[in-house]
Amino acid sequence: NLFQFEKLIKKSGMLWYSAYGCYCGWGGQGRPKDATDRCCFVHDCCYGKVTGCNPKCGGTNPCKKQICECDRAAAICFRDNLKTYDSKTYWKYPK
């Protein structure tokens, strides 16, 4: 869930990433604007590849593990690309 994801990325997902670039937050189109936006694009694609699952599912089923892996990969991507985060240019960027 979102709270677990925020704990994983050590930032507030709602504050830092909810309206960043073309892919962070709801929806997305076009080319990612920078490496941070690309992390969101890859995260969206990862969720899209998790078949037959709802990101809110719980328990120890494969769905939860696949979603967790998507979130873990995104957290690593955000960490590795934190220097590209440019809120002055890409915050609330038109989607």
UniProtKB/Swiss-Prot annotation:
The active site is at H43, D71. Binds 1 Ca(2+) ion per subunit. Disulfide bonds join C24-C40, C39-C77, C46-C70, C53-C63, C57-C68. It is found in: Secreted. Expressed by the venom gland. GO terms for biological process: arachidonate secretion; lipid catabolic process; negative regulation of T cell proliferation; phospholipid metabolic process. It catalyses: a 1,2-diacyl-sn-glycero-3-phosphocholine + H2O = a 1-acyl-sn-glycero-3-phosphocholine + a fatty acid + H(+). Monomer. Its cofactor is Ca(2+). This is Basic phospholipase A2. It is an enzyme of class 3 (hydrolase). Keywords: Calcium, Disulfide bond, Hydrolase, Lipid degradation, Lipid metabolism, Lipoprotein, Metal-binding, Palmitate, Secreted, Toxin. GO terms for cellular component: extracellular region. Its main location: secreted. Belongs to the phospholipase A2 family. Group II subfamily. D49 sub-subfamily. PANTHER family: PHOSPHOLIPASE A2 FAMILY MEMBER (PTHR11716), PHOSPHOLIPASE A2, MEMBRANE ASSOCIATED (PTHR11716:SF9).
